[in-house]
């Protein structure tokens, strides 16, 4: 079983979502997790770390060190579910190919719409001539991340708490 599939299967059984897996130099394995209803706290990371350590031992996964973390305020958006969940929030989007000479856009995410398999994601942004709408598919997307909203009055960004 592929490492990402193994991790995803384990996390799903525990009630968590796999956001990203990174292999870093010196055998470091980073796993980013989320939970739609409650977000992630340190105890979640501990629980997942202990479970993955056991699973990796049984499955003979080669790694030196494991880090489990929340995806952070600038969470990556990779799936239609991500874009639907974070509709209404600001994101930075980079397309694989330029649209009107531009690949990078920052704007408000709109929920995916369209026929299954042909869903298009909307991004409302400020164009040269005023408000504009970019529509793209996941296959046209290079990467996307939420834009962190820092509120120093103690309010948290809704990004991880929806």
UniProtKB/Swiss-Prot annotation:
GO terms for biological process: ribosomal small subunit assembly; translation. It comes from the Bacteria. The keyword Cytoplasm applies. SUPFAM superfamilies: YhbC-like, C-terminal domain, YhbC-like, N-terminal domain. It is found in: Cytoplasm. InterPro entries: Ribosome_maturation_RimP, RimP_C, RimP_C_sf, RimP_N, RimP_N_sf. Keywords: Cytoplasm, Ribosome biogenesis. Disulfide bonds: none annotated. GO terms for cellular component: cytosol. Its main location: cytoplasm. Belongs to the RimP family. Required for maturation of 30S ribosomal subunits. NCBIfam families: PRK00092.2-1 (NF000929). This is Ribosome maturation factor RimP. The gene is rimP.
